[in-house]
Amino acid sequence: MSKSNINDAGRRPAPALSAARIDNDVQAIAAATALADKLRPQALLRDRERILPWDEIEAYSETGLGAITVPKAYGGPELSFVTLVRVFEILCAADPSAGQIPQNHFGVLALLHDLGSEEQKRRFYADILRGERIGNAGPERGRNAISHVTTRITATADGLRLTGRRFYSTGALFAHWIPTRAIDDEGRAVQVWARFDAPGVSVIDDWSSFGQRTTASGTVEFDNVPVEPVQVLPVWQAADRPGLWGPISQLIQAAIDSGIARAAIDDAIAFVRDRARPWMDSGLERAADDPTILHEIGRLETDYQAAQALLHHAASVLDELSAVPVTAETSAKASVAVAEAKILTTEIALDASETLFDLAGSSSTRAAHGLDRHWRNARVHTLHDPVRWKYHLLGNYYLNGAHPARHQWN
């Protein structure tokens, strides 16, 4: 475990000076595909040895992918949410841990779009266009609901000061900016953007989950950290201001699960085709000719295609709704569309990563193959927000017309 602004190897986020410019959807998909080709070869080793993807994340920044949702009014390409989803699917099929690290980056940018002032947008969008990364200092540890916040930002004679301890801080170790939820002197929820190298900021690499092992989603401590007013976003206004930041954040989470499912199915197909033996009673020479296996591969592919179709539909809904002023009804519509997709991507990620072993057989469990990482990654990531509450959200909307609560998990 390491503590302070560096990890065990002494790495710090590099100055963001060399980000490429992406101007259209085709360039974004090409950049994601090329990056995925770099992520894939060592993904198993990084998972097994818990090697943090520093070089890979710096390579991600250099592609310019981190700026693809920056609005055109602020110098960005403002690409579609369908493209954003495809980028995450491509990256997470190659390495879902490295692919998840930018998730909070885009979720926070969506919040900046909805709640940020003009000064804040000009400041932070410019940083992103230069290639800087946004992390996250997530919910606090303990038995309280994740909405419970003890982190405080207070006004002092020397300016604003941030104090607290947060966990589930995916991306923070690699980030230039570390936003966190805090309560201000008036008891209101705000989001505070702390600079990674600000005095009093400590990132602790204590993430020890059995899946998504290299996201470095551990602890961040803020000890009387100095911040400027421009670094404080009024999250409390979200309750009365319809927006899309919650659905956008959830959309990316669903895309991560879609990528995990794709990787599991691809590995199942490859193992059955190249390594698996036929069952003795089948009378076949190849496992790939077993009708029960053919049935299951067909079922997995069908379920995956259905989940992906609903995911891309949800992204299209967000593209449509983001082009016009957001109302309470359209904000709810966005949350519903994404919840429907999130259910199916969760279920196919878990199903595919489990069924893989039924189809591939005992030899597929050898540690050398590392196929268990698909299930471990799917199981850990899908716990981010329980599907049972997505079903509840949908039932309450369709039966009672109830709008989903506005937060990053809806």
Feature names for model-found ranges:
Residues 1-102:
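Amphipathic, small/basic residue-rich leader segments at the start of a protein or domain
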Residues 30-33, 259-262, 298-305, 339, ...:
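Generic structural signal for well-ordered, non-transmembrane alpha-helical segments
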